[in-house]
Amino acid sequence: MRGSLRHPQLVSRICIGVLVTILFVLPILYVLMIAFESPKHFLNSPLTPGSVIASNFSQAWSQADLGVQLLNTILYSVVASALSTFLGLLIAFPIARRLLRGHSLLYTFMFVGLFLPFSVIPLFAEARMLSLYNNRPGYILLHVEPGLPLAVILLVAAISSIPAELDEAAWMEGSGYLSYLTRVVVPLIRPALLIAFLYGLLNVWNDIIGPVVLLTNPSLFPVTRGIYNFFGADESKWTLLAAGIVIASLPVVILFAACQRQINQASLVGSVKG
């Protein structure tokens, strides 16, 4: 019986591998191919590789001012993600320990927040009303909320795996609320905090609608807004666009590769308790 099932399982795994390759790997390879092509060859033969040209990267860097925009993106992503992770920790602990009367309702509200659609007009109206339009603090604050629901859900699961006896022991020794969170809870849930931070960072880093709606000053643009300028009503610079995408993606790829071990640890948070 086991031998008869082995072949169908192998075929299914091969099919899944081919499907994953088609859906994820081929688009990446295609963008890389375009980034090293001349505009003329891409327009004449967009599906076949041509001679390798590295000048697309230097042109994209200078024409879109990607150096300044990468610094803006790092600032926006790190600060907004750190704020959403910190606020998520402050919200997650009382939910996990059931210290709030409406903890279940609050947790449900956060869960629903994962599936709410993005609305451009309310975001624009909110930014203008609160003087958060076209400035760095406003752009950062408006990107804290999108990463908050998942941060709360991840941290609630992680905190729930910590024995409640540690809370009682720490408070009997006179430890304050924030002191207990920073000295005891944070070291124990560090992988989950990292995942929440990386998710928030990636969410801000990849945002294209927010910069178009909230920013008009080129000196404030993140890298996605700079790359967006390669689109035109009459002409689009596809090779420079692909080169800009590669440049913008490289820091995130390096970051996730460096944090791979911590990400694997975080995947086990909450699976084993005690």
Residue ranges and their predicted role:
Residues 1-274:
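A hydrophobic, multi-pass inner-membrane permease signature
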